[in-house]
Amino acid sequence: GGTTSSTCNDWTSSSNSYTGCANEVDSTQTFCQETFHKCNENLAVLCVQYSTAQTVPPTTTAPISSPLTKIVVSALSNGQNGNLGGIKGADAKCQADAQKYNKPGLWRALLGTKSKSVQSFFTGSQASSLKVYNSKNELMADNWNAFMKFNTRKQTYFYAFQGRKVDEGTGASPDWADAD
């Protein structure tokens, strides 16, 4: 993740010759930052709600939104390999899964690239003041900065959009085979 080169060619490769890290949580309770997994392995991909705006019909010029009051993190409901169609493809998967399971707002994949770190998703007062919750509305961290470091994380579980707990040791659901 982050600005390392372990991003499965910026999330466009499922080759076993690449190694990558979809920012899943490892056993030390931190986002994996090294090359732990082959890009052809199915892992959980985390998504973050970055806006309360709703998707709107084409006749409306702008989405309706209210100020963001908290940050919510969920996971895709099915494991994914490293070929997510790039960041845009991964973002589209997050948005589609959120809509499928009636999660409001706009969602994007919590993935870094070679040039952009996930830390930069929220900056300034948002990064220091908005609390971070999982999709079951359980407090995970007092703010984005703490969430990125896990130094004061309250709740250790991520959940997929459909409600399944995501395993922290591997970043995958205990049984993706029964996912919707």
Regions found by a protein language model. Name each.
Residues G1-D180:
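Secreted/extracellular ectodomain signature
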